[in-house]
Amino acid sequence: FSGGKIYENHLDVTDETYLDEALAGYSNYNWKLGNPLAILEYGEAQNKNHFENSMLSLSIKPKFKFNDHLSLSEHFSYVLTNTNEKYYIPLNGVPDYYVSSLGAFRQNEARSLFSKQNSIMSDTRLEWDQRYAAHAIALRGGFRMQWDSYQLNTQVGYNTGNDKTPFISSSLLDAATGGTNDQWNSLAYYVQADYNFKGRYYLQATMAAESSSRFGRDTDQGVKMCGVKWGIFPGFQASWVATNESWMAGLGFLNYLRLSAGVDVSGNDDLPYYATRSYFASSDYMGLASGLTIAGIGNEKIQWERTRRINIGVDANLLNNRLGVRFNYFRSATDHLLMWQEMSYLSGLDKTWGNGGKLENRGFDVEATGVVWASPSWQWQVGASVGHYKNKVTALPDGQRYMDTEILGATVRTEIGRPANLFYGYKAQGVFSTSAEAQAAGLYIHDDNGVDR
């Protein structure tokens, strides 16, 4: 069968090649016209397309009380996550397709992935609280350690020969392996102080110092101790429960009113593992030889993103606690944004990770809940909420006005004065409901099977 006709000279057509034979007369066919029924029949099996994920989690929380006011606690957890995945595109039902990374057409492919991540966390905390008449004080302090290791192994190969041997081996065309072996850790010291007076005025102050193996050793910000840089993150919150004032007792419809405000500084340490490391990667030369080429140049100045934030809030209960209203507003400014930055062509690389740019966020949310019916055995509540959040890029590195990034075949733009990570698409003008409308617009199909010549 070829070009829509049956020929006697195509006696060697097999299940795996019939689509290639059928499309042999077309120079620009759409390889996405694979047979979905054949893909399900020949591509589904535990040794073909299969995904398995398992997790083991252990946690202990011992606590020792010295007396009624002083205690020492520990939170230790261990998490093991394993992922095993097989991916297979069958020969039968799928025509040859173009693999851009190889610059050539291939019949089918087989892939496998196995990953393992170990995560250990330890949080040791000392707590003290005391009340002096109308004054209540609580102090907490401790240190938190986190250690992670991640191993990833991947394999890929093309042209298995038939769908009965979907196994990956060195005999496959363009067979390749990859993977990573990452280990990182972080350490944080923190203190927190809470104070309230007669349940009316509340104050909270926090301070944390944190360092991570992912940070560079020569960051612009932070305090250097023990040979590494530490980020310092303070915070302060205050609130007033107005309904606990004696002069508010006469307002029967208002059961609870709390006003709060605060400021804090936080950091984002989600740095790529290799951002501060220079490393080599294997490279194939025309399929004839393999070697090592420099794949990344570490940036020892890279650091955490820093966000400074203010917030205000109102909590109220009214009408004998049958109606609750919550309102929160925040505004934040983030600097040292983590992003790709261009490198000199002399380095042999296009980009590397760095800090640059600034971003503003602001928004609010409102929530209302109401008790429609309440009885000792049954309660009915309804609620509604609405929120609005908006961000704007205020600066980019190297004096740039905008930056374009290619992600999964799409272009994402980050531009000063506009929201981060913009992407655009076509707007649909409508759907043709009849063939006459499509013909009037000059649209048609060349062949009955929809193949474009």
Where are these regions (language model features)?
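A subset of solvent-exposed loop/turn segments in beta-rich extracellular surface proteins, enriched
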Residues: V13-E41, G93-A104
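A penicillin-recognizing enzyme superfamily signal
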Residues: A438
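Extended repeat-based solenoid scaffolds, especially LRR ectodomains
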Residues: A441-G442
